[in-house]
């Protein structure tokens, strides 16, 4: 009985760990993508830190311009 219970417990723990691995893989993918994007731009632009807030504001304005008003 003890052995069967241990096996069940093992199976449960492995099932719980599967989604964590998937999340790590997704994180790695996004990290590698952002690394590639960084390599596209010259090092100089990394030194002058581009304000992220302005970029988000521009995105919001573009999004608002594309979406029909009152819809």
Swiss-Prot record:
GO cellular component, one term: nuclear speck
Keyword annotations: Nucleus
InterPro entries named among the record's database cross-references: SNURF (IPR009847)
GO molecular function: ATPase binding
Main location as per UniProt: nucleus
Other facts noted in the record for this chain: Encoded on a bicistronic transcript that code for two proteins, SNRPN and SNURF.
Similarity annotation: Belongs to the SNURF family.
Protein name: SNRPN upstream reading frame protein
Species the sequence originates in: Rattus norvegicus (Rat)
